[in-house]
Amino acid sequence: MLRVTIIDSFGQIIISRVENATLAYDLINSIKDIDSYVIEEVS
């Protein structure tokens, strides 16, 4: 399980859990104007 934390250019924070890296990058690519993101492995 991965936790994806995304901060967009408006300062909004989006936190989501996904099953694998493919889904994590699909999520990241679906959001416009990303300022930064972190992908962490969680149990």
Predicted feature descriptions by range:
Residues 29-43:
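Short, mixed-charge low-complexity intrinsically disordered segments
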Residues 18-24:
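A short, sequence-level motif marking secondary-structure junctions
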Residues 4-6, 18, 37-39:
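Hydrophobic beta-strand residues in large extracellular and virion-surface proteins
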Residues 1-14, 29:
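Short aromatic-glycine-(Arg/Gly/Cys) micro-motifs in beta-strand/loop hairpins
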